[in-house]
Amino acid sequence: MGYFKERLYQQYVILFIFYFMSMAALSSLITVYMRDIGKNGSEISFILILSNIIALIIQGLIGYSNEQWGTRKTVTIYVLISAVISMGLFFFTGNWLFGLVYGLANAITLGLAPLFDVLAANSPYRFGQIRLWGTIGYAAGQQISGIIYDFLSPKSIFILYLACYFASIVFLYTVPKPEQPIVSSEQPAEKKEEISGGHTIRNIF
């Protein structure tokens, strides 16, 4: 794993860890949070259904924006929008307001995931070597969210979400644009095989 010593690879690692950690911080304990603020089962299901409906609209909008602006600009704009929107999670508790705020923030966060896959696919490394760290980041985000939820405050998960979200934007600008991938030392045929799904576990290492 000599590539792990490369500065660029480390930047990809940190980018994916922070982004997927933010995703976990926002969504993994949201039903527990809603229980703690007094929501019953039907109210929680309503909010989650509303979130899914919003996601259908937002994902199409993100795809269109990506075609117009490119990946880096699209991610930046939508992260800033969802960060501003998610501030309402600290204040709103009503079903409609909380549902709209959470639905928009979560839909944008999840909707950006395919763009991060584009970043991984266009990196000078195999797809699995980058995407693996997203899974690790998500798992770490779940664990950290649980700890700070219990020992700090329930709303601390939203602070973690915002902190990781903004950190991912910082590291987004340290990696090449997807439209202009840098030359890789990896074998092109091997990289293509990995992206298509062949020998995923082997290619991670």
Region locations from a protein language model:
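Intracellular juxtamembrane helix-capping segments at the cytosolic ends
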Residues: I30, T109-P124
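Residue-level signature of mid-helix packing/kink "hotspots" within the transmembrane helices
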Residues: N52-G60, Y138-A139, Q143
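Helix-to-loop junctions at the C-terminal end of transmembrane segments
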Residues: I57-T71, Y149-D150
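Symmetry-related core transmembrane helices of the 12-TM Major Facilitator Superfamily/SLC fold
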Residues: S156-T174
